[in-house]
């Protein structure tokens, strides 16, 4: 027996559904509590809960975690402009430490001696769950049936069918999909060929560019200390703001990402992401920082952002390093307040305006027209001192 009572991170998909009978029949677990987190994935979570019970769970719980997800994870990463390998807004990676936190709290509440997840041995999520759970409760046992059972996807589906679990995917195109409020990721099937163009059927949040409006859509995003608080002048809570921005950007074909990325486990993986709100928010936030942060801070922050994104992707959300980086990021956001105007059109998002009460932009210094207050005479002395090391080096070389 691996454990008596287990809390399982449950999604309603093939792997987590099969985990329920597998834990009971193969590993002798006496009680399985299926826990589904509502992260804005748009599913009928009551149906997911009922499916868990039908699959053999002794108890099935749905927890609304949308507010926590947006404010504690998504917006924290936004302040860091966190994009993995410069492109991916980390929608899935950000959800895992939150789910781990919910799992641990539930396990402690119901007296479980272990938690479980349905991650395979190839993916990043196994690392994110195991490391996060270990950081939150080092004594809690973590079970990963899909990492050990050695079944192919077809065999996993067949195993589930033995226990009355229907397969929710077509065997001819078995896409693996993860979806939450911040975005959607798709892999498997024809997408495993990096040369193959993704069929339109893999997309759900964004329109094909050919079907988008001919006229651009303009939006205004207001930020306070790096956190979005209003869209087009309307103050909105984080969940509603992200949802509405997903709709507006998605209708204009914004947010599609097709990339071959480097997984933590050492392999390359072709991933299709849809992150309409995530892409636009990072773009707008970067534009606001360009207006309000000094040059040296902006330059240094880029390195912090890359490290931050790697930490999140690699499952180190609860690491001391991320906590230390948060201190720096929090300082940079003290004056990251203002409004950014973005044009959405035919698959592109373009910043076309920005303003802030803390703007470091001085039009009288920047203008080439009448009213120029820049001291042009000072430039000669500045250039002499600035270029002095280069001239000395050139003299020595001679």
Swiss-Prot record:
Positions of ATP binding: 9-17, 37, 118
Keyword tags: Amino-acid biosynthesis, Arginine biosynthesis, ATP-binding, Cytoplasm, Ligase, Nucleotide-binding
Main location: cytoplasm
Any Pfam family: Arginosuc_syn_C
CDD domains: ASS
Protein EC: 6.3.4.5
Keyword Ligase: yes
Binding-site residues for L-aspartate, renumbered to this chain: 120, 124-125
One GO BP: L-arginine biosynthetic process
Keyword Membrane: no
Pathway in which the depicted protein is active: Amino-acid biosynthesis; L-arginine biosynthesis; L-arginine from L-ornithine and carbamoyl phosphate: step 2/3
GO molecular function: argininosuccinate synthase activity; ATP binding
Covalent S-S links between cysteines: none
Location of this chain's protein in the cell: Cytoplasm
One of the record's GO cellular component terms: cytoplasm
Catalytic function, reaction form: L-citrulline + L-aspartate + ATP = 2-(N(omega)-L-arginino)succinate + AMP + diphosphate + H(+)
Binding positions for L-citrulline per the UniProt entry: 88, 124, 128, 176, 185, 261, 273
Subunit and interaction comment: Homotetramer.
Family, per entry: Belongs to the argininosuccinate synthase family. Type 1 subfamily.
Name of the molecule in the record: Argininosuccinate synthase
């Amino acid at each position: 027996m691996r454990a008596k009572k287990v809390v399982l991170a449950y999604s309603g998909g093939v792997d987590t559904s099969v985990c329920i009978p597998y834990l009971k029949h193969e590993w002798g677990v006496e009680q399985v509590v299926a826990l589904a987190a509502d992260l804005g994935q748009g599913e009928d979570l009551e149906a997911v809960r009922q499916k868990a019970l039908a699959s053999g769970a002794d108890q099935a719980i749905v927890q609304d975690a949308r507010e926590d997800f947006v404010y504690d994870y998504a917006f924290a990463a936004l302040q860091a402009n966190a994009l993995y390998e410069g492109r991916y807004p980390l929608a899935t990676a950000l959800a895992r430490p939150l789910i781990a936190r919910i799992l641990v709290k539930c396990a402690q509440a119901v007296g479980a001696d272990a938690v479980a997840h349905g991650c395979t041995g190839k993916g990043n999520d196994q690392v994110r769950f195991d490391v996060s759970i270990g950081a939150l409760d080092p004594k809690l046992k973590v079970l990963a049936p899909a990492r050990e059972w050695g079944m192919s996807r077809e065999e996993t589906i067949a195993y589930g069918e033995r226990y009355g679990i229907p397969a929710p995917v077509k065997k001819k195109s078995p896409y693996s999909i993860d979806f939450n409020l911040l975005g959607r990721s798709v892999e498997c099937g024809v997408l495993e060929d990096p040369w193959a163009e993704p069929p339109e059927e893999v997309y759900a949040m964004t329109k094909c560019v050919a079907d988008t409006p001919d006229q651009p859509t303009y939006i205004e995003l207001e930020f306070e200390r790096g956190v979005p608080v209003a869209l087009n002048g309307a103050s909105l809570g984080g969940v509603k703001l992200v949802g509405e921005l997903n709709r507006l950007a998605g209708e204009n074909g914004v947010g599609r990402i097709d990339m071959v990325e480097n997984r933590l486990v050492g392999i390359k993986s072709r991933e299709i992401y849809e992150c309409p709100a995530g892409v636009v928010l990072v773009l707008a936030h970067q534009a606001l920082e360009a207006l309000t942060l000094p040059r040296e801070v902006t330059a240094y922050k880029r390195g912090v952002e890359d490290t931050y994104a790697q930490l999140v992707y690699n499952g180190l959300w609860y690491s001391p390093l991320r906590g230390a980086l948060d201190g720096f990021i929090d300082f940079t956001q003290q004056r990251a307040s203002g409004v950014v105007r973005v044009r959405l059109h035919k698959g592109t998002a373009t910043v076309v305006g920005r303003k802030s009460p803390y703007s470091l932009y001085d039009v009288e210094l920047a203008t080439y027209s009448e009213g120029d207050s820049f001291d042009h005479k000072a430039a000669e002395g500045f250039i002499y001192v600035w270029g002095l090391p280069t001239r000395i080096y050139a003299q020595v070389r001679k």
